[in-house]
């Protein structure tokens, strides 16, 4: 009988402890599919399971429940993962919670509903956000002017804007592309939409859309914009009630002395900018640094700021990466003149040599906005008509990771910021 008890004791304590969590590491050494890792995190949230985002732990790793379904899905998508025991999980969480560590575990509660503001037809340029959402297998809904004016933004938690022009100047493409079929088509469609919506000018339509987006953010929504959507949005708000469009855009001259009538109090991020008056110049204002940059491609990088994960979890979430040095990339709006960024706005990524802000974040009312300069993080100088980037060649792109940080940010359990 004594031998039987000994045998039972050995069997009982030799059974392996069942794992309770799956760790998706996000450091440079362990993960080969950083972008798809965001997709599996979103997919887990869709299953109504909670996830912990381990800020500053191994590149901003994710802690998921241990289920066979999640492990199988990780294998299908080629995502590296580690199965953790209860004791190992507790050890990691204790490390993260230590006051001596600049780390934090943030709970992600639900999959955010994502809207992408984009014309329904194809455009002669790519959209970095729709490409990375598709690659990461994160679902989104395309909406445009008609849906925004019908208050359908209220159905979504997160709104993306990319290569857009909210000023009614058709992207300032007049000089180079006014005879191009796509330009003529886009102009006619915009004019028809303006009339259908009850406006006599496209600039009036775009202002109405901008005001709806502003109200969406003020009411608690999250807006993420890239490239020309960033500065043209603020310009449209600042120029409310002022005609800044020349005759080739709206069939009448611009308003005399319009620069003096610009109201910087209306903007989200920018101040004291000077508008580009010439319709022949591919530029909206002095906000953008594209033509003023003095740096060559080979050394064009920007640096992510470092924040206290425990005291400032929001910007910490938005800068999670496996490197703090990000390759620069250009766009119609590449970066922002630091002196024209409002003091209330956080500069999360900067190119110090040129005095450029590349990646900025702010609060508006109950909501948040992030502006990210440049067009495509893996195409240094994307031009009209260029082939789209194949993200299969860049599965761990640090520049694209910043976009996906913003996608998951609305999923975080809201906790009052301490600073």
Question: Where in the sequence are the language-model features?
Answer:
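Positively charged n-region of N-terminal signal peptides that target proteins for export
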Residues: 1-4
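Hydrophobic targeting/anchoring helices
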Residues: 19-127, 136, 374, 416
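Extracellular ligand-binding/catalytic regions of CAZymes and related secreted enzymes
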Residues: 20-26, 32-63, 243, 341-419
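Helical hinge/lid and interdomain linker segments adjacent to catalytic or ligand-binding clefts
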Residues: 22-32, 62-72, 122-230, 234-239
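Catalytic cores of eukaryotic secretory-pathway lumenal/extracellular enzymes that build
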Residues: 183-184, 198-199, 206, 218, ...
